[in-house]
Amino acid sequence: NAVIPTEPDNDDVVDPPNDNDSGSQSGGSGGTPSAPAAPQTAPENGDPCIPILFNGKSVNAGTAVESTRNDQTVTTIVIDSEKLNDMLVGESELAVITIPVVSTADVIVAELNGQQVKNMEDKQSVLEIQSDRATYTLPAEQVNISAISQQLGESVSLQDIKIQIEIAAPTTDMLSIIENAAEQGSFALVVPPVEFSVKAVYGDTTLEATHFTAYVERTIVIPDGVDPAKITTAIVVEPDGTVRHVPTQIKVIDGKYHAVINSLTNSVYSVIWHPQEFSDAASHWAKDAINDMGSRLVISGTEDGLFTPDRDTTRAEFAAIIVRGLGLKTEGDSPVFADVQSTDWYSSIIATAHAYGLISGYEDGTFRPNEKMTREQAMTIIARAMKLTGLKEQLPDQSADITLQSFRDASAVSAWALNGAADTVQAGIISGKSANTLDPKANMTRAEVAAVIQRLLKISGLI
């Protein structure tokens, strides 16, 4: 797969860290400066009666502005500050403000000011933008208006900052990049790509929020006539043509099929068909998980259509698979461990896993990427991923000793891995090497990795 980093064909396998649980941390939703947006044309209308749904109740609180930008038509719905504040006052937390937009424009924009976003954040409210091709569900706290305010300068009033949440068709140039990526990656685009973005505009300065601290949901409508059984996943396509899987489910919503996508970043998304079957997994116990993860671009084969399911996994391979499975964007290749060089194929992957708190390495500052991954090491890393997906907080409070008491070799689990092992067992991601053994020191095979990553995503409700 030309646009997806592949795992090296070697017999080295994995081990996890002697980890002190550093906890998960994401890249944050801080704004990234970008070039100022092209000026909009004068509005063709200013309809003050666009309905906005507040917890399902319709209130005329939006004004529609039609414009053009870079040869694309734009419909902007500007939310009335006074009416939004009136709706928020006295309401309980977790309100959902829905903006249904009926428009054929290339770009759909919901526009609020920074103070409105701050008021919504204080109420833990969620903003939902609906168009005929996609829906974007954005918790107000993920805009991170405080970080945006700091970047623009604290002298700038929140009232004067425009927050623009967009659902857009890609530009002609970006569409060409996407089509080329599909050809190079041997997958078929099932629906037209959609770009999701969040921008903060103040004067001539535009900041773009590219990263979130929790998974943010968006849906893409599957057109009539498309077989939902011939969809394997949604993907993100970057401006340089690189592609990554993002966790995706196919659901029926209001009588139509939708791809429900959860991601920690904004970008251009599409839905693809990429069936994958590995010949040496045809009769393997993990066949379904292996082929599913392969079809989703999470795992790749070794050579000649083989997966070598019973080969042990290296630490670098495990890091790659969990980063891909979670849909994390790899950024930067500055080594964070003494034994990882910027020229190594796994350099940016390991840096990303470290940045998200998934791995911490050894006390001597090494990661030992070509050593084999043990089961207890893998359980520790997966438990950290559970924090990122929100699964950890759903577990009932129970001691590790009680959780693991049914395994006769529970005492063999290292002290640093005890809580991680208990969390993964309690969540149902790890069920034991046998009915009553964990075998924590055993190496983890490629088949086992495919199975546990699939379980992590399924039990977290992401696929």
Q: Where is each model-derived feature located?
A:
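Proteolytic cleavage junctions
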Residues: 1-21, 32, 38-39, 46-50, ...
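Short Lys/Arg-enriched alpha/beta "domain-start" segment
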Residues: 43, 48-85
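Proteolytic processing hotspots in large secreted/extracellular or virion-associated proteins
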Residues: 69-240
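Secondary-structure transition/turn motif
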Residues: 81, 102, 132, 261-267, ...
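C-terminal, surface-exposed recognition/capping segments
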Residues: 233-234, 416-422
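Feature responds to low-complexity, polar/acidic, surface-exposed segments characteristic
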Residues: 247-254, 263-288, 300-316, 322-349, ...
